[in-house]
Design a protein with these regions (language model features):
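Extracellular/periplasmic catalytic domains that process cell-envelope and extracellular macromolecules
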Residues: 30, 93-97, 147, 181-182, ...
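Catalytic His-Asp segment of secreted/periplasmic serine-dependent ester chemistry enzymes
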Residues: 158-230
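C-terminal motif of bacterial Sec signal peptides marking the signal peptidase cleavage site
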Residues: 14-17
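Sec-dependent N-terminal signal peptides
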Residues: 1-9
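Bacterial signal peptide processing site
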Residues: 19-22
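Active-site segments of SGNH/GDSL-like serine hydrolases
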Residues: 107-108, 141-171
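Conserved SGNH/GDSL esterase-like catalytic core that processes O-acyl groups on lipids
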Residues: 29-129
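Generic structural signal for well-ordered alpha-helices
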Residues: 89-90, 135-142, 173
Length: 230
């Protein structure tokens, strides 16, 4: 579990208003909000939406926690010519660094790795080169927040119906765990653990498309992540 200096209380954006009191009483100062950003692909976007919804229904006293989700369908770290997540995270860190960043990709990355021009830099057939390049992209994503005080939470994906996608996203979770091991500001979480589905079978947690999570499993994972943040 991970912690930030705040009590878990959720508001739908903005700080809590100061409460009124009897004349002459000391004013109540609204606690400073804690900003959480969930970033990644459509799976991350679904989780971020569930976290935001769960947060809005949370308790009403203490430090407000505001959840923001930024996601791009069909993206990951494989194709910076399509969407450059490390670059986007560096922009976020420079402009609006949150207290907590939840980053989750992997299920769109069962493919060769390209550079920003679309040229292939590592094929899936060359396992060593692919792993080395993917580790570097994970490291750049994590290190974007090294000087901001942001707590980075890597979130691994569950295994979907497609075997190749499942083997790849579980392998990516292993790579992320390795990269995070020597970074004190990076926490590793796993949807397979948060939902209780396990790393090998996810039939009860998949939606009808065989890739995304069901609403109930998104909600379960969101609740546990928010509890960890609190």
């Amino acid at each position: 579990m991970f912690a930030v200096a705040a009590t878990l209380v959720i508001v739908a954006g903005g700080a809590s208003a100061c409460s009124g009191g009897e004349a002459g009483s000391a004013p109540t100062i609204a606690p400073q909000e804690t900003k959480v950003t969930v970033a990644g692909d459509s799976i991350a976007l679904g989780l971020g939406t569930a976290m935001r919804d769960d947060a809005e229904g949370g308790p009403s006293d203490g430090a407000p926690l505001v959840v923001r989700a930024i996601g791009e369908d069909g993206t990951g770290l494989a194709r910076p010519d399509n969407f450059d997540w490390p670059g986007r995270l560096e922009e976020l860190a420079a402009d609006f660094p949150p207290e907590v960043l939840v980053f989750s990709v992997g299920s769109n990355d069962a493919q060769d790795l390209t550079d920003e021009t679309g040229a292939t830099v590592a094929t899936m057939a060359d396992h060593e080169a692919w792993d080395e390049e993917y580790r570097a992209r994970l490291a750049r994503s994590f290190d974007a927040f090294a000087d901001t005080g942001t707590r980075v939470v890597w979130l691994g994906h569950i295994r979907p119906e497609d075997d190749e996608v499942g083997e790849t996203n579980r392998h990516i979770h292993e790579l992320a765990t390795e990269v995070a091991a020597d970074r004190d500001d990076v926490i590793v979480e796993d949807l397979a653990v948060l939902t209780g589905s396990g790393a090998d079978s996810t039939s009860e947690c998949l939606s009808s498309d065989g890739l995304h999570l069901s609403r109930d499993c998104y909600s379960e994972a969101a609740e546990k992540l928010l509890a960890g943040i609190g």
